[in-house]
Amino acid sequence: MPTLRPSSYPAVWLGLLLSISTGVSASADPLEEVVITARLRPAPLVETPVSATALDPATLRGAGVQHLQDVLGLVPNLNWASGTSRPRYFQLRGIGETDQWQGAPNPSVGFLIDGMDFSGVGMPATLLDLGQVEVLRGPQGTILGANALAGLINLSTAAPQPEPLLRLESTVGEASTAALGLVAGGRLAGRWGGEEGAWRAVVQRHRSDGSRRNATLGRDDTNGLDERTLRLRAAFAPAARWTADVSTLWVEQDNGFDAFALDNSRVTRSDQPGRDRQLSRGLSLTLEREDALIVRSVTAVADADIVYAFDGDWGADPGYDFTSRFLRGHRTVSQDLRLRSAGISDWVAGLYASQVDERNDQLDLYGGEVYRELVSDYRARTLAAYGMRQRDLSPRWRASAGLRVERRAVRYADTDGSALEPVETLWGGDLTLEYRPQEGGFGYLSLARGYKGGGFNIGAAIPTARRVYDAEGLYSLELGWKHADDGRGLTAEVAVFHMWRRAQQVSTSVQVDPGDPLSFIYLTDNAARGANYGLEAALSWRPSPTLTLQGTAALLRSPFTDYRPDDRDLSGRDQAHAPRGQYSLSIDWRAARGLFARLDLQHAEAFYFSDSHDQRSQACTQAALRTGYETPRWSASLWLRNALDRTCAQRGFFFGNEPPDFPDKLYVQQTDPRQAGLTVSWTLR
């Protein structure tokens, strides 16, 4: 298949837009309105002054199988770093962490599930009965503060409905893949039931042997998946003018981790395969009162217990045996209290408080003996005040301004003797100008400031001068245009952006001893300056009631403006995990008699694996297919993941790991091979 180069994306999209605008006839069905809920004021996607993507339930069912990982390629300028069994670390517009081993957990991409903050631990994103996925690109400093320097991923589970619901879903596939799920719901009984009181529950078990064969142990399940999901959500009216929404989740992902091989194949030789287990629990309570003022309170707890272990030598050579294990407990408790004016909602004001507690226990073994051990405790308390004011300048023009100020106090201690208590005051906000012409469409120009707290590097080998790093500030200028035409079944949007990074935080690593694969010093440093700029476009067209075409495209440049770590000059080089181009194309066909088919193509250009070396991935295109038959009561579909059977690198490390000479070499984690399966769903009521 020919590869579409980034330089050709704008021409392709311009041709599509011109052909659609001049040659399509009216569509039979009006478009369903998509509402973005993650911002301070909910608004339709086509009237939201930010580059955003919303994936609805139909897209999640059609393009996905089990996890959010299946649909990430549909979002422009979104990437993720592997090295885990499921995506945990994300990058938006080239900004975001690739791991989190030690020190301060300061994620750049916010990750919320029904208001529960799983930023930095975003694995429990199973797809069954998920309502909507929203991705807001660019700094969201007014909304979420330091956790949204690069943007925000917001997941909403399906809302409860009073109508009775009982649905079973079963999946079987290659690699011993099997899943069974139940979705149930209906009207709430008792004093809080009322006309609109309702509940909804999801239970699912998913298992797979994975796509690796361990030659040393003669097993095919060392990189397998074993995931259990339990979600419950209820909505009711506790009093007059009050509404309440309670959401809780329990997700256990007891997965194997045996993904790397010395020859970069899918045949591993580790004698002590790793493990990637995350037990996620969360609870959120949203209260809202509508009157002259709208009062909204969101109280949430998100808890993640993680066991992450791997075979450090990736082999079974006698006398050369390294293993590493991390125990990580992460909890975020947050309270958001917000007031906004009723009606047009021309102002919003709020207070936010949170506490993040994290405990890490690292144990490295050499030949079965303790080689390195570190236990640390981290606590961060944040208090913030924020507000937004918007005003109509004329029937076509509107201006808005937002501001957030937060105070952040951190306490850290570990068994190496480190004890730190930094305190910071941080701020962010945005200025936005909106334009609505008479002939339709929506344009905006925004200037936003995002921020990310400073932190520290730990360990006895860290040089004193690099033990502490500063807070990062980011300024973003964005110009966008959105258009929706119900008559033609068309929505389109395009945004261009330029972001300036000051005291840019850069994650890097150094291998102290070439003969020790676990002797990495993981640290965060401040680059003097950096820039991230590019273009994002999305198009959805329904030329007939049976056919929907969708596509996205993204261009990105992310050069370091001035960065000279140690004896290297990275000025002008792109940042890690920031592909210069991405695109996706989806074709969804649904016949009137129940037959359906869907094709998804996703492409990403090459990117650097790390800021500590210059090794890169290769450009990669993947395809997914689904076809089947559906009725109002049941559906059956055959699906094919990675239909082209492409081998793509998700993560790469460059170091010495092969005795006796330990030459530096690139080791990569490959994508899963082609996999076929069958999913059947029955709606019993």
Give the residues covered by each predicted segment.
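Face-selective signature of the C-terminal outer-membrane beta-barrel domain
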Residues: 237, 242-251, 278-310, 321-424, ...
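C-terminal beta-barrel architecture of Gram-negative outer-membrane proteins
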Residues: 185, 462, 560, 577-630, ...
